[in-house]
Amino acid sequence: MENYQGQHGYGADRVDVYGNPVGAGQYGGGATAPGGGHGAMGMGGHAGAGAGGQFQPAREDRKTGGILHRSGSSSSSSSSEDDGMGGRRKKGIKEKIKEKLPGGNKGNNQQQQQMMGNTGGAYGQQGHAGMTGAGTGVHGAEYGNAGEKKGFMDKIKEKLPGQH
């Protein structure tokens, strides 16, 4: 029986044009087509429509030879950024989206990262180098009426308990 495998009418492993296994009960090689007609299928051919069957035209397979063709468009944002320690790290989806939003990225993120890397401060702390006087400096996120808008982090810090 082994010498008859691969020939028409014998139990060979059959695959469709995409390499998926095809059982004996599926369309092709002698099974009844949905319209009642019989499709004739030879080696490497396409099944035609029988009397009353549905006809599907042969598709040409387009192969690129293993080369990935890319479109000409590119994104202006890179997938990695400086981590402040001399290395690089991957950006998350949120960071990529924030970069693309208009007016949302004014360099605050890079300035904050540079300050963290240079001063060695903890995350979220801002440098208060000259404010050692007892009660005479600006305290925390309370800026007074200097005409400066509060930043996003300052608004969050205000709402946290025990940070005053």
Swiss-Prot record:
A Pfam family that this protein carries is Dehydrin
**Listed GO biological process terms:** cold acclimation; response to abscisic acid; response to water deprivation
Basic and acidic residues bias locations:
147-164
Which stretches does UniProt call biased (Gly residues)?
A: 25-53
Instruction: Spell out the family assignment given in the record's similarity comment.
Output: Belongs to the plant dehydrin family.
Question: Which InterPro entries does the annotation name?
Answer: Dehydrin, Dehydrin_CS
Keyword field contains Transcription regulation: no
Give the protein name, as stated in the record.
Dehydrin Rab16B
Q: Can you tell which superkingdom this protein's organism belongs to?
A: Eukaryota
Task: Give the Low complexity compositional bias ranges.
Answer: 107-117
Give the induction note: By abscisic acid (ABA) and water stress.
Q: Which organism is it from?
A: Oryza sativa subsp. indica (Rice)
Keywords, A to Z, come to:
Stress response
Where is the region Disordered? 1-164
Q: Which GO terms describe its cellular component?
A: cytosol
